[in-house]
Structures are given as C-alpha cells and as structure tokens.
Amino acid sequence: MMAEQVKCASPVAASGAGPGPVVNAELEVKKLQELVRKLEKQNEQLRSRAASAAAAPHLLLLQPPPPSAPPPAGACSPLATHRAPASTTSPGPGALGPAFPGTYCLPSPAPSLLCSLQPADAPFVYSKPAAGFFGGGGSPEPGTAGTPPGEAATPPLPPPTLLDEVEPLDLESLAAWSEEDDYTWLYVGSSKTFTSPEKSPSPLQWCRHVLDNPTPEMEAARRSLRFRLEQGYTSRGSPLSPQSSIDSELSTSELEDDSISMGYKLQDLTDVQIMARLQEESLRQDYASTSASVSRNSSSVSLSSGKKGTCSDQEYDRYSLEDEEEFDHLPPPQPRLPRCSPFQRGIPHSQTFSSIRDCRRSPSTQYFPSNNFQQPQYYPPQAQTADQQPNRTNGDKLRRSMPNLARMPSTAAASSNLSSPVTVRSSQSFDSSLHGAGSGVSRVPSCIPSPGQIQHRVHSVGHFPVPIRQPLKATAYVSPTVQGSSSSGSSGSSGGSGSGMPLSNGTQLYSTTGIPTPNKAAASGILGRSALPRPSLAINGSNLPRSKIAQPVRSFLQPPKPLSSLSTLRDGNWRDGCY
C-alpha cells in the first residue's frame, strides 16, 4: 500500500498543479497522519515490551528481513526511499506527501527487530522513524500536518535493556575484605580464631606441636600400642607362649611346628584348641611351681636330645627314673585326662606337651609316657646314625603325640589322636618336646616291632599290671635286633628308663581306668618306632580302626577288651563335653 502511494505521489508531484493531484495529496496527508498515530502506539508498545524482552539485547544486531520477502503494508522498497527525496525538491503542495513516506520507509535495524515482537495485526515493520532524514528531506509546513509528523519525528530513546536496569554491586563494600582476610575462604571454627602468622604453620611445626603436646586420646593409643607390642614380643620368647621353650629347643624346625599348628587350625576344633590352651597355661604354671626340678631334668634331656643323642642311653634312663620319682610326688593335673583328650587330636604339639606334663603330675605319671617313650627311643643307639636323622625328626613328632596318648583317659582317645596324620605329627612333636627327641626318634624307627611282636607284647601287657611295663617298653621301642638288650635293660631300669613309654602307658591306663593298656603300649611303641603314620595307626588301632595298622593292633589288643570298652566310653564322654 505504501509503495503504491509513493509511486502515485511521485508522478503527481512531477506532473504539476491540478485539481486531481491536490485531492490526492490531501488524501495522502490524512493517511500519513493515521500512520503516524499508529506508529506512536506501536512505539509505546515496543518500549514496554523492550523493557521486558531486553533480556536478549543481541537481537538488536539482527539485519532487517531480506527484500525478497513481501514487505508488509507501509513498507517501501529501496527505490521508493531514493525517489522520495527527489520528489521533495519539486515545488507544489504535494511535496509533503512523498516526504513523509520517505521518512517511514527508511529502514533501521532496531525497529525491524522490535517489530518481530509486534502482534500479527500490526501492519508496519519499520516503526522507528529516521530522525536524521528530516534534516535532509525538509521540514514539514507547520500549518498543514506539522504536529503529527513532528511527534512521530521525535527520535525515541533506545529501549532499556536488562543490563541497564541491573544495579552494579560494590563488592568491597558488601564484603568487608582486608589484607588479613586472605584465608577467610577456608573454614575456620568460631572457637579457634588465629592471628595471621598462626594460620599457616609448616607441617614440621604442626607435627612438632602435636607430638610435644599429645592429647589424652593419643596418650591412650600410645599406651595400648606399647602394651600390644610388648605382649607380642614377650609371647614369642616366653616359655608360656603356645610354642613352649622346650619346643624351641627341639631339633625339629619351628617351621614344621607352625605347619603342624596350622594343620590343626584347619580342623573344626577351634573351641577345643582355645580350651586346651587355657588348660595348658594353667598346667604350665602349676608345673613350674610344683616341679622345678622335673622341668630342669626334662630340659637337660631335651638339650641332650637336641644334641642328637650325645647322652648315652643309661643317662636317658637315669633322667627318666628321676622324672618318674618326682612325678609320683606331684599333684594330679587340675584338668583331667578326659578333658584334654579332645585337644590331643587338634592341638599343636605345644599343647600336647602340656598334656604330657599332666600325665607327669597325675599319680600314675610314674609311667609318664614322655619319659617312657624317650627311654625306649634312646635305647637303640643304632638309630642315632645320620641316616636315621630324618626318621628321628619324624619320631620326635610322634613322641610329641605320645604324651597325648598317655594323657588320654583310654587307649581309644590316644588312638584317635594319632589316627590322623596331624595327630601323628603332634605325637612326634611331643616326643621331640620331651627329651632327646632327635636321637630317640631315629632309634625308634629301627626299634619298631613287627605287627606280630606288637601283638605278642600287647597280650602280655594287657594281662600284666604295671610291672609288665618293662616288656612293653622293650617290645614297643626296641627294634627286633635290639629287643633282647632293650628288654633286659628296660627290666633292669624297672621300666622307668627303657620300657618307660609302654610302661607309662600301661600304668597310666591303670591309674585312669584301673586296667592295663596294652593298646597304648603297643601304640606308643609303634609311634616311637617310626615317625611314620603306621605307628600312629597302631595307636589308633587300639581303639580306632582308622589306619590299617590300627585294625591289626585292635585284634592284638582284643584280649584286654574291658580296657578298650572303657576307653571307648570315655572317648564318647569327652566328645560330648567338648562339642
């Protein structure tokens, strides 16, 4: 529409004066006045919207829509803008018409953007008049249409943006910062207000301060840590530690002892082990107080055995006799054998050693298995040869378990202890913890009697009371070659030295069950004879059919059935109590 008006006005101005052109000019002026009023309304709307939409001031930089798009009513092409100034130069009343359209057709980027916010019914896109055009295009006459165009010609202020409305904040006034507050961004407790030099102590200074002025909590932690360290250190070397001092003197290495103890822990006897250790500690204390001399003798014997049988067999016999005499006077161990029997299976040899001490204390300890075992083991000097040293170590382990057998209320318990290879190990360790484990054990393998011999001995043992100890000793520990000499020697020593082990078993059985324990004697003989599982099997055989040897031993030991039955009963009793 605007373009048509401009096109019409330009030829009229060029043609000259006439009635038709004058009427057209007046009509154009009226139309232009209406347009100005509409533009003023649009400007007001745009200003109000710009205040709200100023959040996107970058839109003002957008270019006007391309000329290819159909311009809305009132918009003129660039051609019209150029023709309008030319028309103003021509004299005549129609000069006004083209001048105003020129002013409104002048494109400006700001109105074009703001017009995009206009409602759809707004016909004009270019709503902002170019203020500078009136200077070039001539001012309108005041009489005709000066006032409305003048109002529209006043250049509107640029719409305010959000940035203009935002008040700048004075950070220094809001946050009272000072040079000393460089670290205030770090949290500082209200209770602790430091001066600037105290805020950044060096790590060394801080450590020095904390260490020089320890808190009560730190002191308590220090004391507890010291106590633990001292306890752990002393427990290693203390004779009351799980690994007794006698064990440390054994010829067997500590690694073997550890492996044996680990093997026990793998079994389901943890509770039993704990109880056994408690009993062992109490027994050791009682033993130390009541039998210091016995401990000296045992230590000397163990030392001699650690020296690989430097002492002669007679010395061993003497030690065993002395120990037995002392044992007779010792009070019985507080924990009875049935109590300890369960531990014999799964407890490390150190505990088995405590069980040996129990046997010593008990009135029947005269037949203390440890001494008896040691004596028969020591009898065969042949076993002390270097070739038999490995056997000796095994024998030591078997001997350790032997005290368990003596401790056992019945041969069944002893056999059960030795039934597993672990029990065999414990017996060996026990023997080694006893005296002369190394040399005695090596002799034992050579002295182990054949099953037939064992059977014969078992029968004899079962029928005979404690005095039969001597034949038991000779049979159990002496090899077939040495049997004659060993048996005679054992009888000479009254079973205390040579036949000490079988005798101790038999006597202890008498004390506990009142029945000779040929089973124990045979088992102990087998154990002493070899650090091999076979002796352990024989021991088990007395009451347990676990091992092949155990079964034949059973048959051999059958004559003393009352003893085996008692042992089985006791075995069941202690099992019930422990588990």
Curated annotation (Swiss-Prot):
The modification Phosphoserine is found at residue 241. Residues 63-73 have a biased composition (Pro residues). Signal peptide: none annotated. Expressed in embryonic stem cells. Expressed in adult bone marrow, brain, kidney, lung, testis and thymus. Expressed in colon. Isoform 1 is highly expressed in brain. Isoform 2 is more widely expressed in bone marrow, brain, colon, kidney, lung and thymus. Residues 9-21, 141-154, 244-253, 289-305, 374-390 have a biased composition (Low complexity). One of its GO terms (cellular component) is cytoskeleton. It comes from the Eukaryota. It is found in: Cytoplasm, Cytoskeleton. Residues 233-243, 362-373, 412-432, 502-516 have a biased composition (Polar residues). Residues 21-56 form a coiled coil. The keyword Phosphoprotein applies. Its main location: cytoplasm. Residues 1-21, 60-95, 135-162, 233-258, 289-313, 347-454, 479-516 are annotated as: Disordered. Keywords: Coiled coil, Cytoplasm, Cytoskeleton, Methylation, Phosphoprotein. The modification Asymmetric dimethylarginine is found at residues 469, 554. InterPro entries: Slain. It holds the Pfam family SLAIN. Interacts with MAPRE1, MAPRE2, MAPRE3 and CKAP5. Interacts with ZDHHC17 (via ANK repeats). Belongs to the SLAIN motif-containing family. Microtubule plus-end tracking protein that might be involved in the regulation of cytoplasmic microtubule dynamics, microtubule organization and microtubule elongation. This is SLAIN motif-containing protein 1. It comes from Mus musculus (Mouse). The lineage of its organism: Eukaryota, Metazoa, Chordata, Craniata, Vertebrata. The gene is Slain1.
